[in-house]
Amino acid sequence: MFIIPTLRNLKQMSIRILFVTVFIFSINAFTAEKEMPSTFKDGDPSKGSSLIASCAACHGADGNSISSDWPKLAGQNQRYLLEQLQYFKSGERVNILMSSVLPILNSYTDQDLLDIAAFYSSQIQTNGQAEDDAELLAVGEALYRSGDMKKAIPACTACHSVNGKGNELAGFPSVAGQQKAYLVSTLKAYRSMERDAGDYALVMQAVSQNLSDYEIEALANYMHGLYE
């Protein structure tokens, strides 16, 4: 006798598959960090400091942007920064706010980009201050730390760590203290699949699909207030 699965059962199966996939993906990244030597070559912060004039206008001279719409680059891991700069340069990642600096970015070599990444990575990030809203904080913390299995939303800690500092070897970005408006726009861009540059974009697209606008705001608020 064959049992035909209902739509509800199929959805539950899909949720389990997504959770297992993300869990295995995260475990593999964690294992790589623990057992495999890094082959990533660090850039030269001193050389990078002479190449950031066009970056500083929006991201700040020390990588701490004033506007919430622009991400803080200070303290971000080099691998992530380098990859994003390369995506912008190649056109794989498109953002209207970055369009004005593309001519300059296109004139830089990969070593220049690495040096810029090294400079910003060496800077100290300023702490963020989460909005003092008990419900918003509770929702954000629960999603960040535990996810929501019923909605197929895995915990953010799997890739971004409990303290929000990410995973440098894997290239998972630090989200702690990041600008709130930027986090909101980024999660929405992944949810709409507008942002699709890089191998890991598929993971972020999948985990953000079932996030509501309120949950995105809650997550962004919680991550903005994270610091060690």
Q: What is each stretch, according to the model?
A:
Residues 1-13:
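N-terminal secretory signal peptides that target proteins for export/translocation
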Residues 12-20:
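Sec-dependent signal peptide recognition
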Residues 26-28:
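N-terminal signal peptide c-region/cleavage motif recognized by signal peptidases
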Residues 30-52, 69, 122-149:
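Electrostatic cytochrome c docking/interface patches
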Residues 35-92:
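The feature marks the first
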Residues 46-56, 78, 82, 146-157, ...:
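Sequence context surrounding c-type heme c attachment/ligation sites in exported
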Residues 48, 55-61, 116, 153-162, ...:
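The canonical Cys-X-X-Cys-His
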Residues 66-72, 88-132, 169-174, 192-218, ...:
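Axial heme c-ligation environment in periplasmic c-type cytochrome domains
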